[in-house]
Amino acid sequence: MNSSSCDRSFGPYAEGCRGGFDFTLLFEESILVVPITALLLLAAPFRATYLLRKHSVKVEHSYWLYCKIILCLLLLASQIAFLVCWTQSPVVTTKASLPAAALSIVASITLLGLSYVEHVYSYRPSTVLNLFLLFSVLFDATRTRTLWLQGYNRPAAITALISTVVKILMLSAETIEKRGFLRPEYRELPSEVTSGVFSHWFFSWQLPLFRVGYSHDLEIESLFPLEKHFKSSYLQTLLQTAWAKAPKKGDYDLLLVVFKTLKRPILFIIFPRLCFIGFTFCQPFLISATLSWAEKDADSNDMNQGYGLIGAWFLVFIGLAVTTGQYQHLTVRATTMVRGQLISMLYDKASDLSITAANPTAALTLMSADIERIDSGWRTAHDVWANLIEIVIAVYLLGRQLGLACLIPVGAAIFSIVGSVIAVSFVMARQAMWLEAIERRISVTSQMLGSMKGVKMCGLSEVLGTRIQAMREEELHISGKFRRLLIWNMVLAYLAPIFAPVLSFMTYSLLAQSQGGRGNLDTNRMFTSLSLFALLQEPLASFVTSLSSFMGSVGSFVRIQAFLKTDARTDDRIIQYNGETEHSLISGVSSSEEKHPVSPIQESMMKTEPSGDSPDGNAFVIRNASFGYDRNETPTLSNIDAIIPSGKLTLVVGPVGSGKSTLMKALLGEVGIMQGSVHASNSTVAYCDQTPWHMNGTVRESIIAFSRPDERWYQKVLEACALKQDLTQLPRGDLSNIGSRGLVLSGGQSQRVSLARAVYAQKSTIILDDVFSGLDAHTENAVFNNLLGSHGILRDLNTTVIVVSSRVKRLPYADHIICLDGTGTGCVQGTFDKLNESDNYVSHSDVSSPDGARSKAPSSGPASSSAPVPESSAAALAELDMELTESKKDGAGRRSGDVAIYMYYMNAIGWIPTMVFVLAICAYIFCQSFPTIWLNWWAAANAKEPFTRLGYYLGVYAMLGALSIIFLVLSTWQMIVTMVPLSGNNFHQSLLKTVLNAPMSFFAATDAGTTINRFSQDLQLIDMDLPLSALNTFATFVLCIAEMILIAVGSYYTAIAFPFLLATLWVVQHTYLRTSRQLRFMDLEAKSPLYALFTETVTGLATLRAFGWRDALEKKHHELLDRSQRPFYLLYAVQRWLTLVLDMIVTIIAVLVVVLVTQLRGKLPAGLIGVALVNIIQFSQHLKLLMTFWTTLETHIGAISRIKSFTSDTASEHEPQEKEQPPSVWPSKGTILFDQVSAGYKESEDVLKNISLNIEAGQKVGICGRTGSGKSSMVSCLFRMIDLHGGRIIVDGLDISTIPREEIRTRLVGVPQDAFLIDGSSVRLNADPAGGLTDAAIEDALRAVELWDIVTDNGGLDTSIEELHLSHGQRQLFCIGRAILRPSPIVVLDEATSSVDSRVDELVQRLVRERFSNRTVISIVHKLQSALDDFDMVVVLDAGKLQEIGHPQELLAKGPDASTFASMYQSVATEKKEDK
């Protein structure tokens, strides 16, 4: 056929022309030119209209725009010239030539207009133009080649060549980013947003990140900012709106709503996933075509077809690389959005919970563990349906090769799928049990870490350590059932891919043999089928794991939905506004004064609120109301009628457990109103909880919080709350960090910082729930006078102040008093004088009304006569040192790994279990890989004599499959069931031991959330993610080595490239890991403050809602979540870059092998070529898996690194000399000698200075002093919680510096200021943590502290302690009851009666006299009357020095001029008598 006739036919192949390796001209013009041009002409108007209507000008005019215009004009000129050439050509024009040329001219004009609009109105390169120009260049190049080969119309060929070159230049120009030309407001957009389609395909937008990460330490601020659709506020609004409209009737409503709100990003994943499937199943056809071509006679003149095969392999593998990267990256984008939505919703819901329903641990588990499972499940969700499609296609193609034998893998697949679906339900149930066990352990651990001073003082370290370790062992035991199910699931997943080829080849061979030998298993059929089995294996295994992972995420969705459907707190109050604005700043404080910078969060709070005056002149009015925490139970308080007058001081008093705190929470709307009503003049008030609530931050941040910053007002508040002198002792003053829950602060300081926050907020109403209990009398007088005296700042502001107090000495100064009687029914109210006239709690208080009490302020001098001892400054200094150390350590180690970490991991497991695992994996991989060689031998034997020794070849093949399953189960069992409990127990024990042995300065300097992360997130990684990563990484590593060997066997010259391949892989991995490790560290670090804020919010719900800070905290949460999303998203994004690069490397290997096949035709056996090509397909998959598993392992091994650093870097409080074991009866008497004792935190300044004191057996000793004088330090020294720098302490003849510290703490009895009870545990366990006491003994102790009736009313000793709903004072009484049960002759009370009223204080003193009559008692006292009446000796401390010592009556007799104790007593007595 001549060329002219050939090109006028449709073709598509030009048979007989140009070597048969070309398309016809008609086909090229009608299929390659016209359609793509028509698509441009259709798309361009819509795109241009959209940009002009929806977008503003984004790019400044520049030379680059003019370059694009010039290129467009050149293209138009070349297209016109091309049309002219066609019209002048007498030959070889087709019926499509002129229409195609004319359309191209129109397209050139369209390109000119669209290029201008895209350049000016879009901040990214045009996707429409880039795609059109890309395909147009490829298709035009094909047509240009045809024209050159024709040779009939050289001018047309030249103009076509010029047009193609111009399009290449246009494509280059349109591809370049416009960031340098963007207007200033758009230049900070994320790199991904401003990148073009090719940058997205090949992830080149990440290269700046790799450059910085390779050579520098990355910071979150240096990462790409989030684009709009990832912003948590946007995502929350999106989900919240849809969730509000959802019916919420089914278990999966939340899942459906999330899908509805993110429908577009989720559905966009489908197209690249389908393209990936298409490219994947091109591979068997390429193998078949390559083997057929290789088996032909080497003299055949068809080398062009060989070149075509090279091009086909290249295009298919490039297509696989791009589509893999795109569908995985789009999946990560959708997953990131889901994460942002759910975490935002969880926080929003948590901030709406009632205070009784708020469980920090349960909520945090949802935010951490469940969100992680959803993340994992959603990243594989699209694989579930895609794997089914892949299975169907693979089976169909197998049917074309093996006939009915293809039904074997179908049956195997159905068996695997059905078995997996059945197993998934059991997996979910076991997983839920495991998560609950984790939650229980973390709850107890978190509580212990938050109260370490109480734990150590009570001698509970060993008891709690044993209990928590037992919970850990129980947790691992429960998880064992889950792990065994995972192995069963894995066996189901691998049975089909391993045995399907065996059974299929056997069935095919037997059928072919029975049919007379038709369809012999030759090389082509064997290896084409084997490639299909390889492609079938991946979706079969992936389907099972993806389905399991997705169903696990569905279970987490159900758990989160249940949480979101939890009843929110209901504010039953009636809020009445009068339209006035709240009072302004105090007089003399000008808004023009110098202020500290205002954060965006603080700006959101700079608004006025309605006044505190209701229409009837009262701040609150309670009318016949009943309050309770559970509407289905008896009210805690009932029939309450009371008023809170506006602008007055109201005191709420009553016995311990009478419901004072409940009444305050009712005023805040935190407790349900079962009947009656509460009228409030304002929805927000300043509130100080009985247990001070603090967020982790500086003193300044804690006080100012979200109020308007004003420096003069701030300084005035510090002075009023007697904090200035405390701040001078902190290393950074008010910029010192106070730690989690204010751990760095002493009890009194914590209460005063909380009080300062309430005063600073300048709310019209302040509620103070027993905030003076932790202050010494002198400091209390000063603070009370400064705030509530006749000229106190709260009086000047006309603030409504409600004070709950267990001390009645302030009653005469109250304008109004509400008195609860302890029965829970009714109350009395009125002025002090009025209440004194009737029979009630006030009249029984024996407090008289001095003249002018309410008009005259209690007199007091400064809060302290000398600077307080810096008891917490050492902790703050330790914190500073730790921050610097961690910073240096992180900077040095983030970008690189450490082989020592892997050694540390293996040591925790044991070398023998590790070697068993390694040998089992190697055996498994051998049995997996060798069958390829075996099949080559079988095919070669079949070629010589069909069906020869069929049983022999099938039997060995089946045996190898069975052995691979056996070794797979053995290796997986060894890792998941045997090695995980070993490492899990060892690491937890190391962490727990480190924490229990850590000094108190560690807990002051280290955020509790960071330590909890070691016990939760890191151990979770070690329990599941790390072992699976290690298993997958090592197995895939050995498999890749085996496949490289097989590729080299099949195409031995390829082995020459392997060293270069390995070097390239090392460079890529090295470059990648230096960035990915940092991103992983940043991901974990960014989660810690997010989790910390979540926990702080849940524990401080009453406070933050009272202040009206919910919105401000939610804004802060959005900022932290957005900060967390950046490394989270980019970590997965850089993994996609790595996947793409690896795919490119595999593409090079595949092309190299095919090039060798074509160039060495006839020299390579077809069977070995098949071995090489099949293994290339598998190597492509496994190399990506290896690098993914390896990088995942490298990030997961960070958990081991952090634990290793934590255990090695955390100092132990124990000293080498502390080895002496005291006699079992020690101490037997109770004598204590302080001999010139100086003590402090490690190398810090002494907080006790040269203390000498002798306490005889049975003496009752009271320790007095101003706040910060060293009282708690003296107790801490006795319990060895601070270190001796000089001197010694002798207890019953033994120097305690030689005795193990925990031994001392278990031999002495300590009652801490903050009562420590183990929530979630029974009353019996809390009363008798060590066990061994009878129920009668426990009952006797609880009766003594008047708590037995509460215990019996709630179910007895086996009732959980939190079900008793003990008040703060009752919790202290419980601890005293626990002290009664311990027989030690030494009892130490650290302000144990700070939160009880006078009656209970008298009860405690009576118990000291009666139950501790033969014991030595050391008590820190603030109530000096108690020291006068109940103690044999008083020790007065000042600035860490022993000021004086003696019998209280003797010291008092010396008079205030000669005695510090007498001076302190007189300063209190001159105002008001103490309680009796």
Swiss-Prot record:
<dbReference type="InterPro" id="IPR017871">
    <property type="entry name" value="ABC_transporter-like_CS"/>
</dbReference>
<feature type="transmembrane region" description="Helical">
    <location>
        <begin position="156"/>
        <end position="176"/>
    </location>
</feature>
<feature type="glycosylation site" description="N-linked (GlcNAc...) asparagine">
    <location>
        <position position="1250"/>
    </location>
</feature>
<dbReference type="InterPro" id="IPR011527">
    <property type="entry name" value="ABC1_TM_dom"/>
</dbReference>
<feature type="transmembrane region" description="Helical">
    <location>
        <begin position="97"/>
        <end position="117"/>
    </location>
</feature>
<feature type="transmembrane region" description="Helical">
    <location>
        <begin position="532"/>
        <end position="552"/>
    </location>
</feature>
<dbReference type="Pfam" id="PF00664">
    <property type="entry name" value="ABC_membrane"/>
</dbReference>
<feature type="transmembrane region" description="Helical">
    <location>
        <begin position="384"/>
        <end position="404"/>
    </location>
</feature>
<keyword id="KW-0547">Nucleotide-binding</keyword>
<feature type="region of interest" description="Disordered">
    <location>
        <begin position="842"/>
        <end position="870"/>
    </location>
</feature>
<feature type="glycosylation site" description="N-linked (GlcNAc...) asparagine">
    <location>
        <position position="798"/>
    </location>
</feature>
<feature type="transmembrane region" description="Helical">
    <location>
        <begin position="64"/>
        <end position="84"/>
    </location>
</feature>
<keyword id="KW-0472">Membrane</keyword>
<feature type="transmembrane region" description="Helical">
    <location>
        <begin position="1045"/>
        <end position="1065"/>
    </location>
</feature>
<keyword id="KW-1003">Cell membrane</keyword>
<feature type="transmembrane region" description="Helical">
    <location>
        <begin position="485"/>
        <end position="505"/>
    </location>
</feature>
<feature type="glycosylation site" description="N-linked (GlcNAc...) asparagine">
    <location>
        <position position="682"/>
    </location>
</feature>
<dbReference type="InterPro" id="IPR027417">
    <property type="entry name" value="P-loop_NTPase"/>
</dbReference>
<feature type="transmembrane region" description="Helical">
    <location>
        <begin position="266"/>
        <end position="286"/>
    </location>
</feature>
<dbReference type="InterPro" id="IPR003439">
    <property type="entry name" value="ABC_transporter-like_ATP-bd"/>
</dbReference>
<keyword id="KW-0067">ATP-binding</keyword>
<dbReference type="Pfam" id="PF24357">
    <property type="entry name" value="TMD0_ABC"/>
</dbReference>
<feature type="transmembrane region" description="Helical">
    <location>
        <begin position="23"/>
        <end position="43"/>
    </location>
</feature>
<dbReference type="InterPro" id="IPR044726">
    <property type="entry name" value="ABCC_6TM_D2"/>
</dbReference>
<feature type="compositionally biased region" description="Low complexity">
    <location>
        <begin position="855"/>
        <end position="870"/>
    </location>
</feature>
<feature type="transmembrane region" description="Helical">
    <location>
        <begin position="305"/>
        <end position="325"/>
    </location>
</feature>
<dbReference type="GO" id="GO:0140359">
    <property type="term" value="F:ABC-type transporter activity"/>
</dbReference>
<dbReference type="InterPro" id="IPR044746">
    <property type="entry name" value="ABCC_6TM_D1"/>
</dbReference>
<comment type="similarity">
    <text>Belongs to the ABC transporter superfamily. ABCC family. Conjugate transporter (TC 3.A.1.208) subfamily.</text>
</comment>
<comment type="function">
    <text>ABC-type transporter; part of the gene cluster that mediates the biosynthesis of the fusahexin, a cyclic hydrophobic hexapeptide with the amino acid sequence cyclo-(D-Ala-L-Leu-D-allo-Thr-L-Pro-D-Leu-L-Leu) that plays an important role in cell surface hydrophobicity.</text>
</comment>
<feature type="transmembrane region" description="Helical">
    <location>
        <begin position="1167"/>
        <end position="1187"/>
    </location>
</feature>
<feature type="domain" description="ABC transporter 2">
    <location>
        <begin position="1232"/>
        <end position="1464"/>
    </location>
</feature>
<protein>
    <recommendedName>
        <fullName>ABC-type transporter FG02316</fullName>
    </recommendedName>
</protein>
<feature type="domain" description="ABC transmembrane type-1 2">
    <location>
        <begin position="916"/>
        <end position="1195"/>
    </location>
</feature>
<feature type="glycosylation site" description="N-linked (GlcNAc...) asparagine">
    <location>
        <position position="836"/>
    </location>
</feature>
<dbReference type="InterPro" id="IPR003593">
    <property type="entry name" value="AAA+_ATPase"/>
</dbReference>
<feature type="domain" description="ABC transmembrane type-1 1">
    <location>
        <begin position="274"/>
        <end position="552"/>
    </location>
</feature>
<dbReference type="InterPro" id="IPR056227">
    <property type="entry name" value="TMD0_ABC"/>
</dbReference>
<dbReference type="InterPro" id="IPR036640">
    <property type="entry name" value="ABC1_TM_sf"/>
</dbReference>
<feature type="glycosylation site" description="N-linked (GlcNAc...) asparagine">
    <location>
        <position position="696"/>
    </location>
</feature>
<feature type="transmembrane region" description="Helical">
    <location>
        <begin position="1021"/>
        <end position="1041"/>
    </location>
</feature>
<keyword id="KW-0813">Transport</keyword>
